[in-house]
Design a protein with these regions (language model features):
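N-terminal leader/targeting segments
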Residues: 1-83, 90-92, 203, 207, ...
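Conserved hydrophobic/aromatic pocket- or pore-lining residues that grip, position, or stack substrates
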Residues: 215, 235, 263, 318, ...
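Membrane-interface helix/helix-cap signal primarily in integral membrane proteins
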Residues: 53, 57-258, 396, 401, ...
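Feature for secretory/organellar precursors and membrane-associated catalytic proteins
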Residues: 100-104, 368, 588
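Alpha-helical transmembrane segments of polytopic membrane proteins
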Residues: 24-34, 371-372, 474-479, 533-538
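Hydrophobic alpha-helical transmembrane segments in multi-pass membrane proteins
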Residues: 3, 11, 186, 239, ...
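Hydrophobic alpha-helical segments of integral membrane proteins
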Residues: 204-222, 231, 239, 247, ...
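Non-globular, low-confidence helical/coil segments that flank catalytic cores
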Residues: 98, 142-145, 149-152, 156, ...
Length: 665
């Protein structure tokens, strides 16, 4: 199963790297190849000879890869068909539908998703989901009304097809919109014509959205303008829109951003709590005159409780990719236990991988997918073979304790000897407790080491940096958030108002203490290693180095594994040759940003729009410079004071060292 799920995932990844969807000839060839692979797998996989079985196994994996490629292509073709006709771009259309998700408010208005039921343009394949903005223009303009998830509206909107900036090393916005099913962007063009309709959207998704909105409102009422309210909201319902930029920077520079996203740690904790509650209630059913454990074992009820509880919390988090991965692993292990089967942890991870990609084949385009699955895979790989040794060691200790107790009872000693025996037993228990504590700390350190080196190449690929303080910061932050902050915040989620307010206040205070520690760690000298975006060869060599380093003790030349990282950490220079220059005009929308490079110098002409517009300085220019490996600009030239040209300069000056600034202001 592991190989088939991996091959299926490889096919999905291959499709997402294509510039165009396959045509009719490719579909015909793929179907023929798939049928041939299935025939070979069925005919030769059960053979007696090892070579015959190997051919059948390879054919089965090829069929799985082709199935993944074809499935992702079919899903993409179906979704791309829901496109806004070009002739309707920039024209007013009246749409009727419901608000979906959590609206986001800022100084310019409100942004929200809108599920369309009807449109007056009578377009048959109209985009099912729109990303809309309800702007506030001028001082006299009225603020947008409060938009509640599930409320139905009739709006006059002006739409356009999704179009993102195309730049090297910058997040692909179009892929993100496609993954979320957003096939048109726009704004409310006539606010006075907006009409709230009777009734609400039905369904589980709408109910969950309304619950998330109520919880966010309760947290806002309890915390007000608290500095770290956004992190509390993120831990409670998975919405990260309210996290301030300063907190985001500290979390990013210390490698702890994963802690404020509801991930496997939180879903597993909630699932374990629900399993404990369900199993405990089932075992005590005799107190109410029921013998339910005789009908269904309490262990199976606990497994079912873990699945249901984990699903509820993952839904509350918006079912992001890490939460999906954790819940599918929980569900796979729970279903296997309920059916009387035992699955290896790697098989559980493989099942979760296949389920996530079947539900959302675009998940491979998000950093969370790779970081989440690779982190768990690294932990499983690093701990493989050690759990059996640990169990044998614990069994030997238990046998020694039992033998000692039996010898002690066989010949009762005198009173002083009894005290000496009691002291000896106490010392033995203390040694065992200290030994268990040391082993747990060692196992936790080994897991943290595995995650750190496994995610470093991916962090360099996605964020063009490696946080050097990540291991130290995570060693403190993970137990702090997992054992203190998250349970307290979840207690606030469960408690009714106003009993929830003290929990949220205490959770915010604990977050504030954590952020002070992380801020000190981030400010302790050079804590972030900036690297250019690695190429395919550097990533492949780094992956080999990771696997090599995580091999068991005694593996040949295990200490030489860091040599495979050299192409990643000491990349080839990207500057143009001597005597030449390279000019790159960045796609920043309205405005300009041009990078001019020579063999030893770099000049940036304009920095694009600022936060009042598309914020291209922070979203486009800075990530591009980091991905290109530009650590210092010799000159920043600002042509004139227009915000489309000078608005992004503060973001560049804050993120990149600049020798001189020349401006026509």
């Amino acid at each position: 199963m592991r190989a088939r799920c991996g091959a299926f995932a490889l096919g999905v990844v291959a499709l997402q790297q294509q510039a165009a969807l396959p045509g009719a000839a490719a579909w015909a060839g793929g179907a023929l190849a798939f049928g041939l692979c299935v025939w070979l797998a069925l005919a030769w996989r059960g053979g007696v000879r090892a070579r015959t079985r190997s051919i059948g196994f390879c054919a089965c994996c090829c069929a799985a890869a082709l199935a993944g490629f074809g499935y992702a292509a079919a899903r993409a073709q179906w979704r791309l068909a829901d496109a806004l006709p070009a002739q309707w771009e920039g024209r007013d259309i009246v749409v009727t539908g419901a608000v979906r998700g959590l609206p986001s408010r800022d100084a310019n208005g409100t942004r929200f998703l809108f599920d369309v039921d009807e449109n007056d343009a009578r377009i048959a394949r109209f985009p099912a989901t729109l990303s809309l903005a309800w702007y506030t223009f001028g001082r006299s303009a009225a603020s947008p009304p409060e938009l509640v998830p599930g409320d139905r509206w009739r709006l006059r909107v002006r739409l356009k097809r999704p179009h993102g900036n195309a730049n090297f090393g910058v997040r692909d916005a179009e892929a993100a919109w496609l993954a979320r099913g957003i096939r048109a962007l726009g704004y409310v063009s006539a606010a006075h014509d907006a009409q709230r309709l009777a009734g609400r959207a039905s369904g589980i998704a709408a109910m969950v959205d309304r619950l998330r909105a109520r919880l966010r409102g309760r947290i806002a009422d309890a915390l007000g303008d608290a500095a770290h309210r956004g992190i509390v909201v993120a831990l409670a319902i998975g919405a990260q829109d309210d996290i301030v930029d300063g907190d985001r920077r500290i979390l990013r520079d210390t490698g702890t951003s994963h802690l404020v996203a509801i991930s496997g740690l939180h879903v597993g904790m909630v699932g374990g709590l629900c399993a404990w509650l369900a199993g405990g209630f089932w075992r005590r059913s005799g107190y109410v005159g029921r013998n339910w454990p005789l009908v269904v074992p309490a262990q199976k009820v606990a497994a079912l409780g873990a699945i249901v509880g984990g699903a509820g919390y993952a839904a509350l988090a918006g079912f992001n990719v890490p939460a999906q991965r954790a819940w599918w692993m929980l569900a796979a292990a729970g279903v296997a236990y309920l059916s009387g089967r035992s699955l290896a942890p790697s098989s559980v991870l493989a099942a979760a991988l296949g389920c996530v990609l079947i539900v959302d084949p675009w998940a491979v385009t998000s950093p969370g997918f790779w970081l989440s699955f690779c982190a768990v895979a690294a932990i499983l790989f690093a701990s493989s073979g050690r759990s059996a040794a640990r169990e044998a060691r614990d069994l030997d200790e238990a046998r020694g304790s039992i033998d000692g107790a039996c010898r002690e009872r066989a010949s009762p000693p005198a009173c002083p000897a009894r005290w000496r025996a009691a002291c000896a037993r106490a010392r033995m228990r203390a040694r065992r407790a200290i030994g268990r504590l040391v082993r747990r700390v060692r196992d936790a350190a080994r897991a943290q080491f595995a995650v750190t080196i496994a995610l470093a190449p991916l962090t360099a690929l996605w964020f063009a940096q490696i946080p050097l303080t990540g291991p130290l910061a995570n060693a403190f932050a993970i137990p702090w958030v997992g054992s203190l902050v998250t349970p307290i915040v979840l207690a606030g989620v469960v408690l009714p108002a106003p009993l929830d307010a003290p929990a949220y206040v205490l959770g915010e205070a604990l977050v504030a203490a954590l952020m002070r520690f992380l801020e000190a760690a981030a400010g302790a000298g050079r804590t972030v290693w900036m690297l250019p975006a690695p190429g395919g060869f550097a990533l492949a060599m780094a992956a080999v180095g990771v696997v090599w380093a995580l091999m068991p003790r005694g593996w040949p030349l295990r200490g030489a594994a860091p040599l495979a990282w050299l192409p990643l950490v000491v990349p080839a220079p990207l500057a143009p040759p001597d005597g030449t220059f390279r000019l790159t005009a960045l796609d920043v929308g309205q405005g300009s940003a041009v990078l001019i490079e020579t063999a030893r110098h770099a000049l940036l002409f304009d920095a694009g729009p600022g936060p009042e517009a598309s914020n291209a300085g922070e979203r486009v220019v800075v990530p591009f410079l980091r991905a290109r490996g530009v650590r210092m600009l010799d000159t920043l030239v600002v042509s004139h004071a227009d915000s489309d040209h000078a608005g992004g300069a503060p973001a560049v000056l804050e993120a990149i060292a600049v020798a001189q600034v020349v401006g026509g202001l």
